[in-house]
Curated annotation (Swiss-Prot):
It catalyses: L-arginine + H2O = L-citrulline + NH4(+). Its EC number is 3.5.3.6. The lineage of its organism: Bacteria, Pseudomonadati, Pseudomonadota, Gammaproteobacteria, Vibrionales. Pathway: Amino-acid degradation; L-arginine degradation via ADI pathway; carbamoyl phosphate from L-arginine: step 1/2. The keyword Cytoplasm applies. Belongs to the arginine deiminase family. GO terms for cellular component: cytoplasm. Transmembrane segments: none annotated. This is Arginine deiminase. It comes from the Bacteria. GO terms for biological process: arginine catabolic process to ornithine; arginine deiminase pathway. Keywords: Arginine metabolism, Cytoplasm, Hydrolase.
């Protein structure tokens, strides 16, 4: 049965969307990596091998793995989807009317696989064999990008997030990631896996300009029992939280949203870099950031039209306990001394992916934290991450659950 539903963070994971690192990462250089939101350049072939190990580990846990390149390629085989995506990604406003028309025409003659590779991986002017009467190509240098690469597509968690019976197609904060959402819009609209089955679109499905209403999936934890935990990081705004909450309440998909105000810095760019859900009553936390006194609000529905009540609460931990109906939470902090804990948090020790209650996937390099998880009764399925970890994202960042059981 094809079921598009994510009922928790810790129930049995059944289907997940990944994106294998390929062409886009070959375009990362020391001079452009920061603009493209990376701290370093990766050895792409080695990163691909590590990613394959991640995907295979998921498969050993009876998780169906969908790959973004495959889904987008299959979507582009549908003429209506291909035309929409070319018009959206190669717009007159982005390229100028003459060059946009010429470029769309050239790209439309490519086969589905090649077009997918360029849309995800980027295209330089030196690779574009096109005579144009437009100003733009005449003014650019050969190594300038016609189509910017999207290396952050590696982190499928952020671009869209499935919350109970629907999906949010997230308006991304950073320009380097904003085009990613259109690929997911096309896939969720036209690909047979999604087009043939009903689900709710909460947010981001249309062509609106969302201004300051940004939200990214790394900040959204579907903790279960009708509750959603959202971090207001440097990439998720209060406006984004309220818009998603309003849609969840309007559609009767959630009864409460807990919103935590996070420090706005790189080491905790998303909530899941400092806090993840590992078992019904167990969380991994980096205590240097996730202090007990972080400002926290609880949003609950007022009526059934999306209106809400907003109240500040004294403790996010107590709010989570109430939402889950547990007496107290079991908190596992990052391992090692203060130096080791800071290093391991930076290398995504807290960013684990739970595949079933008490079983998580994480990088093998985080030995101190993994040892603490093991002693606390959490089974860690380790994967290599010396290259993938350079992207500042762990197993949770690199995965978008499509189907997961509740608790």
């Amino acid at each position: 049965m094809n079921r598009l539903y994510v009922g928790s963070e810790v129930g049995q994971l059944r289907r997940v969307l990944l994106n294998r690192p390929e062409r886009a990462l070959t375009h990362l250089t020391p001079s452009n990596c920061h603009e493209l939101l990376f701290d370093d350049v990766l050895a792409v072939e080695a990163a691909g091998v590590e990613h394959d190990a991640f995907a295979n580990t998921l498969r050993t846990q009876d998780v169906e793995v969908l790959l973004l390149h495959d889904l987008l390629e299959e979507t582009l085989a549908i003429p209506e989807a291909r035309q929409w995506l070319l018009n959206t990604q190669i717009s007159d406003f982005r390229f100028g009317p003459t060059f946009a028309r010429e470029l769309r025409h050239a790209l439309n003659h490519l086969d589905d696989h090649h077009l997918t590779t360029l849309l995800l991986g980027g295209l330089a002017f030196s690779e574009l064999h096109l005579e144009s009467d437009s100003m733009l190509p005449k003014m650019r240098q050969p190594l300038d990008f016609v189509i910017e690469p999207l290396p952050n597509h590696l982190f499928t968690r952020d671009t869209s997030c499935w919350v109970y019976g629907g999906v949010s197609l997230n308006p991304m904060m950073k320009p380097a990631r904003q085009r990613e959402t259109n690929h997911l819009r096309a896939i969720y609209r036209w690909h047979p896996i999604f087009a043939q089955h009903p689900f709710i679109h909460y947010f981001g499905i249309d062509d609106l300009h969302y201004d300051n209403a940004n939200i990214e999936g790394g900040d959204v934890l579907v903790i279960g029992k009708g509750a959603v935990l959202i971090g207001m990081s440097e990439r998720t705004s209060p406006q984004g939280v309220e818009n998603l909450a309003a849609a969840l309440f309007k559609h009767g998909q959630a009864s409460k949203v807990i919103a935590i105000n996070l420090p706005k810095h790189r080491s905790c760019m998303h909530l899941d870099t400092v806090m993840t859900h590992m078992d019904v009553d167990t969380f991994s936390v980096y205590p240097e950031v996730m202090r007990k006194d972080l400002p926290t609000w609880r949003l609950t529905p007022k009526g059934n039209n999306g209106d809400m009540r907003v109240e500040q609460v004294p403790s996010y931990l107590h709010a989570i306990e109430q939402a889950l109906g547990v007496d107290y939470l079991k908190i596992i902090t990052t391992g090692g001394n203060s130096y080791e804990a800071e290093r391991e948090q930076w290398n995504d020790a807290n960013n684990v992916l739970t595949v079933k209650p008490g079983v998580v996937i994480g990088y093998e390099r985080n030995v101190y934290t993994n040892e603490k998880y093991d002693k606390a009764g959490i089974k860690v399925l380790t994967i290599p991450g010396n290259e993938l970890g350079r992207g500042r994202g762990g197993a949770r960042c690199m995965s978008c659950p499509i189907e997961r059981d509740g608790i």
